[in-house]
Design a protein with these regions (language model features):
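Conserved catalytic-core segment of nucleotide-activated headgroup transferases in glycan assembly
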Residues: 102-166
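Donor nucleotide-activated moiety binding/catalytic core segment of transferases
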Residues: 20, 157-207
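Short, charged/polar "capping" segments at the starts of alpha-helices
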Residues: 39-40, 65, 87-91, 111-112, ...
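Anion (oxyanion) recognition and catalysis
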Residues: 48-49, 145-148, 205
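Active-site and donor-binding regions of nucleotide-sugar-utilizing enzymes
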Residues: 1-110, 172, 178-184, 199-202
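C-terminal alpha-helical cap of glycosyltransferases
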Residues: 275-294
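Active-site regions of enzymes building and remodeling cell-envelope glycoconjugates
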Residues: 77-79, 98-99, 122, 163-180, ...
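Catalytic binding pocket for nucleotide-activated donors in carbohydrate/polymer assembly enzymes
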Residues: 76-77, 95-98, 103, 199-273
C-alpha cells in the first residue's frame, strides 16, 4: 500500500517497513501528525476532496487540546491513533465521534533507556516552548542557578535561545534523533523542573522521575491566535505544582528528599496518558492505516 506521510516527533517511524512512502498524488492514504492548522489541515481537506482516507497519529501528550475549548477545531481525520484513555475521554467530551478514535499507544516511549547510577543530584530543566522563548523560563533559570549542591542540565528545543540556559542539551522535534536525545538526558536525571507538563515530562514520569511544575504560565497569543488568551494548561496528579516563584526552590528540595511521594500517580499517568501497557503500538497503527476507508 502507498501512503503519504507527514512525520513529526518521530511518531511515524517504522511505517516504512510496512508501506511505500510516496508523494501526495500517488498515495492511496494520507497519514498526518495533526489536522488542525497550517499545511497539514490543507492536506487533509485536499485528501477528502480526492476521496483519500486521512489517518492522524498523535504526536504529543494531550492530543485533544485543539479540539477542546477555546479552540474547538473540527477533526478532519477519518481515524485518530491516540495514546491512551485520557486522550479518548477528552476527545469524546469535545464531541469527537468515538468511532474515529483508536487507542494504539505510541512508539515514542520505546526510545526510553534504563536509568544509570551517577554521582550527585541532577536536575533537568525543561523550558516551556511557545512561539518564542517566554519570560517565565527566565524566572526558573534564576531560581535554579541559586540552588547549591545540585547539577543543572537544560533540555532545549528549536524555540529556545540556547545562550540563556545552563548546560543546554539541544534537540529538534523534526530531526530523527530528537527522542534519543531526550531519553539520554533522562538517564541520569533525579528530578525534572518544567512550566507545563508535556511529552518530555511524561517520559520522565514513565521512568519514575519526580516532576516539579513552576506554575507561572500567563496566557498569551500564540502564532497570532488570540484564543490562547483563554487557554489553561492541564496537569495530571503526577506533578508537584508551585505557583509562587519564591517557594520553588523549597519544593524542589522537598521532592529530591522524597522522590517516591507521587510514585503511584506517575504510574497512573504512564498508563492513562501514555498507554505504556499497550504491546506493539506500531502494529496497531499499521492496522488502523490498512483498514481505514472513507
Amino acid at each position: 500500500m502507498k501512503i503519504f506521510l507527514r512525520n513529526h516527533n518521530q511518531v511515524g517511524n517504522g511505517l516504512e517497513e510496512y508501506f511505500d512512502i510516496v508523494g501526495f498524488d500517488e498515495a492511496e492514504k494520507i497519514v498526518l501528525w495533526q489536522d488542525v492548522m497550517g499545511e497539514e489541515r490543507g492536506l487533509a481537506k485536499l485528501a477528502h476532496a480526492l476521496k483519500k482516507p486521512v489517518i492522524q497519529i498523535q504526536h504529543g501528550r494531550r492530543g485533544y487540546t485543539q479540539y477542546r475549548y477555546p479552540f474547538n477545531k473540527e477533526m478532519l481525520s477519518d481515524k485518530f491513533c491516540i495514546w491512551g484513555k485520557t486522550d479518548k475521554d477528552n476527545l469524546i467530551e469535545a464531541g469527537i465521534p468515538e468511532d474515529k478514535l483508536v487507542i494504539t499507544g505510541t512508539t515514542v516511549f520505546r526510545h526510553l533507556k534504563p536509568k544509570i547510577k551517577h554521582k550527585g543530584k541532577n536536575i533537568v530543566f525543561s523550558p516551556d516552548h511557545w512561539d518564542y522563548d517566554i519570560q517565565e523560563n527566565d524566572k526558573v533559570v534564576d531560581v535554579l542557578r541559586k540552588l547549591k549542591g545540585v547539577n543543572i542540565t537544560t533540555k532545549v528545543m528549536e524555540e529556545h535561545d540556547i545562550r540563556k540556559y545552563d548546560n543546554p542539551v539541544f534537540s529538534n522535534r523534526n530531526r530523527p534523533n530528537h527522542l534519543e536525545v531526550c531519553a539520554e538526558v533522562l538517564r541520569k536525571a533525579d528530578l525534572v523542573v518544567a512550566i507545563s507538563e508535556g511529552t518530555f515530562e511524561l517520559m520522565a514520569q514513565i521512568l519514575n522521575i519526580p516532576v516539579v511544575i513552576a506554575n507561572l504560565f500567563t496566557p498569551r497569543p500564540c502564532n497570532g491566535d488570540h484564543r490562547y488568551l483563554k487557554f489553561k494548561l492541564s496537569f495530571s496528579e503526577a506533578v508537584k505544582k508551585e505557583p509562587e516563584i519564591k517557594n520553588l526552590a523549597k519544593v524542589i528540595r522537598q521532592q529530591l528528599k522524597n522522590p517516591d511521594e507521587l510514585r503511584e500517580q506517575r504510574r497512573s499517568a504512564a498508563l492513562n496518558d501514555g498507554g505504556i501497557e499497550i504491546k506493539d503500538p506500531l502494529q496497531r497503527i499499521v492496522e488502523v492505516i490498512k483498514t481505514t476507508t472513507i
